[in-house]
Amino acid sequence: HRFYVDFPNYQKINFEKAQLLPDVVSDFSMRVIPPPTDRTLLSQMIYFGKELYLKDLLLPKLSDDVKIAYTPEQIEWCKDNEGYVWRYFVDEKLLYDSDSKLPGRFINPAPFSKFGLEIDNESPGRIGMWVGWQIVRAYMQNNDVSLQQLLQADAKEIFDNSKYKPKK
């Protein structure tokens, strides 16, 4: 659209009509998901993972790329590199780090995630949200808990009981 010409490409996807329902669920989720109890990267990842999991439940016919406002190619990149991204978070000891720069690198809207590696420009922004979503999905698949229990559980409980193990 001509009004969006000055916006960066990574933001333009949010202006698509297909994003209307996911945006409504995002707004709703802020009212039902308690904010993280700490400022660690893992807590923020899980918080947004819960939001995206709500989209799984409330918008089951939408594809993952629409739910997270990625392109199909970005979803494929996430799937293909999930193990690599996870190893990076673990090896760099970022999960329990509360450095205020981490959300800007891995959670906040951006053209790409900032690992400080050659893959940066290939990676989608907000990769931490996507990984958090996979952790929440694993938790729900491997535990008999209600949605209410999920929403009230803290990040450590979810992570510790998720049995999350990405493919290498």
Segment roles from a protein language model:
Residues 1-75, 155:
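Acidic/His-rich structured neighborhood in mature extracellular/periplasmic domains
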Residues 52-168:
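A cross-kingdom marker for long, charged
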